[in-house]
Amino acid sequence: MCKMAIIPDWLRSHPHTRKFTHSRPHSSPCRVYSRNGSPNKFRSSSTTAVANPTLSSLDVKRILFQKITDRGDELQKAFQLLDTGQNLTVSKSELRRIITDFLMPLTREQFQDVLAQIPLSTSGTVPYLAFLSRFGGIDLYINGIKRGGGNEMNCCRTLRELEIQVGEKVFKNIKTVMKAFELIDVNKTGLVRPQELRRVLETFCMKLRDEEYEKFSKHYNIHKDTAVDYNVFLKNLSINNDLNLRYCMGNQEVSLENQQAKNSKKERLLGSASSEDIWRNYSLDEIERNFCLQLSKSYEKVEKALSAGDPCKGGYVSFNYLKIVLDTFVYQIPRRIFIQLMKRFGLKATTKINWKQFLTSFHEPQGLQVSSKGPLTKRNSINSRNESHKENIITKLFRHTEDHSASLKKALLIINTKPDGPITREEFRYILNCMAVKLSDSEFKELMQMLDPGDTGVVNTSMFIDLIEENCRMRKTSPCTDAKTPFLLAWDSVEEIVHDTITRNLQAFYNMLRSYDLGDTGRIGRNNFKKIMHVFCPFLTNAHFIKLCSKIQDIGSGRILYKKLLACIGIDGPPTVSPVLVPKDQLLSEHLQKDEQQQPDLSERTKLTEDKTTLTKKMTTEEVIEKFKKCIQQQDPAFKKRFLDFSKEPNGKINVHDFKKVLEDTGMPMDDDQYALLTTKIGFEKEGMSYLDFAAGFEDPPMRGPETTPPQPPTPSKSYVNSHFITAEECLKLFPRRLKESFRDPYSAFFKTDADRDGIINMHDLHRLLLHLLLNLKDDEFERFLGLLGLRLSVTLNFREFQNLCEKRPWRTDEAPQRLIRPKQKVADSELACEQAHQYLVTKAKNRWSDLSKNFLETDNEGNGILRRRDIKNALYGFDIPLTPREFEKLWARYDTEGKGHITYQEFLQKLGINYSPAVHRPCAEDYFNFMGHFTKPQQLQEEMKELQQSTEKAVAARDKLMDRHQDISKAFTKTDQSKTNYISICKMQEVLEECGCSLTEGELTHLLNSWGVSRHDNAINYLDFLRAVENSKSTGAQPKEKEESMPINFATLNPQEAVRKIQEVVESSQLALSTAFSALDKEDTGFVKATEFGQVLKDFCYKLTDNQYHYFLRKLRIHLTPYINWKYFLQNFSCFLEETADEWAEKMPKGPPPTSPKATADRDILARLHKAVTSHYHAITQEFENFDTMKTNTISREEFRAICNRRVQILTDEQFDRLWNEMPVNAKGRLKYPDFLSRFSSETAATPMATGDSAVAQRGSSVPDVSEGTRSALSLPTQELRPGSKSQSHPCTPASTTVIPGTPPLQNCDPIESRLRKRIQGCWRQLLKECKEKDVARQGDINASDFLALVEKFNLDISKEECQQLIIKYDLKSNGKFAYCDFIQSCVLLLKAKESSLMHRMKIQNAHKMKEAGAETPSFYSALLRIQPKIVHCWRPMRRTFKSYDEAGTGLLSVADFRTVLRQYSINLSEEEFFHILEYYDKTLSSKISYNDFLRAFLQ
């Protein structure tokens, strides 16, 4: 029972009845069946409905709702037909077939939108109850519709009875039955299976017993295994049905008479469920009247029932629940009629119902009074039905015209001056649609049958006015109509009327909108829009206007988006045909008055209204001149704007052709003869006419009589010309108001004025703007105007400065423009930043000099500590106080007042306001060999060596003690670690070691841990790692002590040749140590290390090895261009290296970097983005961390960190974020320590494990970048972001590990590849550029490398993968792994050739005396210069500016890395070998500096 209660009633079996039940009575059953028995009636239509792709989702939803409401029973039966399993679901294809056959065809996208709104089952099928409820508003679980009666027949029907009943059911609804057959017949074969035939009959006709169907199928030769032709079956059923009907005609007539007699006994509407066809015999007004009467009687019951259905007391119930309550206590009305009735009360079936407001309208006494006509009475005759239809139309018309009756009568009298004069049907219908209510074609036709029974085509206005007055009198005397307030028209009808009205008056409506929107922004004010709507739609109430505005209102500004309204009507652009322009204040009455003035006779007006396709009337010369006068005198903005669109400015002239276009666009079309006469009259010259000349001519008094005296060419007098100009004070007063009238905001005006789109406007542009605003100034007055604004002719303005000009505020003559104010503001900001940095340095110098002095490592020849720019900068960056280059220069100038470039400790502390103390303020001795370039005395070297030896001796002694007491220490550690975590704190470790007889200070213990590589976590140490390190130190502790006793070789005193030999000796004597060091770097045992790591290891073993010596060493070994060095080959074969066999030795060394995994590359890319985000938005990210850290623990959770990464870096997948989280500093509770994170990622180079080695030193030799990794990751910063003030610079004496900066890929000589590609790209470069732009969504000028490879294959460019890789490396200009397609296409299409010269002349290189020192001139050097000459000559000016931007000090010299970066930035075709030869020529002294002026001068002779 419970299961049956859940299933709707209409899913249960049909009962059967032997009586004939008709939805409406027919006069003769024979006529019905003879019509239905026609063969064409059940033949499938040959036409196929086509889906309309222009329908929006809202349109589809509205149409589906309407059709489901009308055909709900058919749809339910169709779903039941396909739902063979009775599980209340159908497949997606079955749902689409039902929608296509029974409702409307849909496109694939439209069907997907419908499907997306239905919850699918777990098996992917569609619950069709949800579909009907969602799109039809049918709550089938509450208000189910039964399939038939409830009882089956006990006796078996005869064959004749079956044929008659089945035939009646089939042919009464033949279209639905045919659609059901076609629904099953998916392949359109015309055949169905016998079981499917039975399902159709039982679903759409009646239930059949097995013996009845067996008898029926045997009669029609339907076998179980044979397909049935349903067209033939229906044809045979039709023939047999006609024969049977003739036999039982008498009984049928008797049953019909009994049914009609039974219906005639009813005095009111049936309280039980009745057929919709019976309700159709009553008008909606009568149903409404009796519905209100019955509701007033059951008001309390209805109120209690609705209150019970609103348990939350929100005041809203569903539409279906409202219908159930009203069906129970008032009338059980069919759903379609109920929806129409509720629309009269302003209710919709798709929204929640405010039941309290609904009942309030009936609770008032006047709302409960009804007419004295009593209950509904059924009208049987045709005349009475037609009469009621006419009354319905008149009632509907008067109900909606009661408020507008006066304006309706006025409009009728205006259009027809005679009170009893006729009016055409078209004019009458247009007035009704505009002033009253929109009538359908059938309703208007029935109204015309009463007003124009003779079908003359005209309507007597006096007759219609009498009907209006009579209706008003009747409504005053009638208690029902007087008491009842008219219902507002439903919004759907109002919206349709508004759209129709706008469509009819499209051009006038659009012109009036544009008159309020001169800038064509698509927005106007709400009040202006209301004025326009009252002109064209006076019937629009305030509530309807608010509803309309809510759909097309801009939320931000509150203005009306009228183009959105036009788009809803189906108009995407301005109308093409332009009738006469309608001014702002021209109402509909004025339009009718114009018709009244002309007033042609009735036949002419009829002809004009019928002929809708005629073109706009051509105007004569006199009419156009009169129109010109009005436009100039009233300053019509539409005409002026259209004129200026062609002339660009008031002084600009337009030709005769453009002037005619202006006339046509502003609604003044003329034929050629009249136009020629017009140009003659207004004095149009061959060179054209400006707007000022045109306006001056028509403002002149002689132009007042164009009919009598043709106007002379406009030659304004001098007084008029002077009066046309205004003074500077008047312009200053009018400028803000005119600007506000012409543009919606200052940005629009600035964008219009900035013709070259560079973000800057000059005073000439400002003058053009004033002319556009019709503010005409003479030159001297314009200069005075600029003076009032604090400007001058040479000044330029950006947008913020221009915006200040547009603000309404008093201007002063001594007020400067913002361009002069802005640098002062920046100066104030920079001074504030400098002062903050200065105060921080003061605090650190007073309290923590040891921390501050770690960055102060340089001394002069006298042993005094000195400071340079980099020392202060490194200190500030170490304390997370970054300054811009300009701010730092101001801070340094505050200390270095004499401009020496360095200051002493005494001078620095004096500037800080601190007294100098030699004992306290001394250089830091820690890490003394890692300082950046200093000059020391020999005595200082000896002191440093002594300190180093003492620390080494202490470390050896401590190590010996630890090894002697290893077992005791191990037992003590195990005993101390009671939690068994293997970790103990440093303090606890010191106590244990002291108890075991190995007393160590915290500094000594820290030094040991660092030397052994034992890591610390939250000030705790894994003692197992510590003990293991002690054991491993046994082998290294017994090293021979000769090296300790002997002084290390000082490479700084050797020349490069001697340095190479000494390096060979060091490598031979320290192979084991070198192998250990290289193995620590080569964790994957590939045999390769990066060039930067290789150089660092050698410099660690070769004391004081300079960069020049190291570079010379790499060149001798021919490995200076190798990004990866095979250290195993180097150690095994360097002892037998000879300079004579250097080439052969280098060729045998294995080449190629080890392959990297895609995940590692992606991780480096993410870390680079994270580093870039932190450095560029440091304070913002810090603030976000602090906002999350509400407990002030300096930690945040994993989810909070991920949210910041998603917002500041990029949205990461779970796998990517897991790998990133593993690299973050996390405490024991799994929370991120964001101070450590910020200090790690805010430095110039991201010190991350995955990024180690990806950056290279900006030097020659070891600075050769990583080809395989650098080009595939975005770790290296783009060249455009490497500003001179923020990039790291290395000193020649700086170890590689301390000066690692983001590197760039190597130079590439792709000239042969590009030369071969030119022929192929010449024919397809436009299409290639288009494809690249489509892939470049962000419009950055570059695309992914994979996209470029795909385009190479698509356009068949015939280049190998290696060549593609070379091109990708070359055009990765931003070092972000992307391909700069614009530069690539330009280099292939723009063929630059060298300057042609005579055979006796060749390019010269500077002589040696012009340069300080020049290197060797090789053939490779000359060939490289000759090849790149055209490119350098083409772009040498911007290249020189770029060189200067990298040369901060203005020395004319650049480092090798910066020089390489600039060459890559301009796509210079150079290989690394050629680059090496250029360096040899321009840097013979190996100073790692290139004179870029000497380099450029070679190409400019």
Swiss-Prot record:
What the entry lists under SUPFAM superfamilies is as follows: EF-hand (SSF47473)
Q: Where is this region: Interaction with AR?
A: 1407-1501
Q: State a single Gene Ontology molecular function.
A: calcium ion binding
Modified sites of kind Phosphoserine = S1290
Gene Ontology CC, one term: nucleoplasm
Q: Which PROSITE patterns match?
A: EF_HAND_1, EF_HAND_2
Pfam families from the UniProt entry = EF-hand_11 (PF08976), EF-hand_7 (PF13499), EF-hand_8 (PF13833)
Ranges for region Disordered: 18-47, 699-718, 1246-1307
What the entry lists under InterPro entries is as follows: EF-hand-dom_pair, EF_Hand_1_Ca_BS, EF_hand_DJBP, EF_hand_dom, EFCB6
Top-level taxon: Eukaryota
Question: Positions modified as Phosphothreonine?
Answer: T884, T1294, T1304
Biased composition (Polar residues) is annotated at: 35-47, 1270-1279, 1286-1301
Record key words, sorted = Calcium, Cell projection, Cilium, Cytoplasm, Cytoskeleton, Flagellum, Metal-binding, Nucleus, Phosphoprotein, Repeat, Repressor, Transcription, Transcription regulation
- One GO term (biological process): flagellated sperm motility
* This protein's record includes keyword Repressor: yes
Q: Where is this region: Interaction with PARK7?
A: 1303-1501
Tell me where in this chain the EF-hand domain is found.
Answer: 70-105, 172-207, 297-332, 403-438, 439-474, 504-539, 634-669, 741-776, 847-882, 883-918, 964-999, 1069-1104, 1176-1211, 1212-1247, 1359-1394, 1434-1469, 1470-1501
Location in the cell:
Nucleus; Cytoplasm, Cytoskeleton, Flagellum axoneme
Q: Where does Ca(2+) bind?
A: D754, D756, D758, D765
Summed up, the tissue specificity of this protein is:
Specifically expressed in the testis.
SMART domains found in the cross-reference section: EFh
Instruction: State how it assembles.
Output: Microtubule inner protein component of sperm flagellar doublet microtubules. Binds PARK7. Part of a ternary complex containing PARK7, EFCAB6/DJBP and AR.
Say what the protein does.
Negatively regulates the androgen receptor by recruiting histone deacetylase complex, and protein DJ-1 antagonizes this inhibition by abrogation of this complex. Microtubule inner protein (MIP) part of the dynein-decorated doublet microtubules (DMTs) in cilia axoneme, which is required for motile cilia beating.
What is this protein called in UniProt?
EF-hand calcium-binding domain-containing protein 6
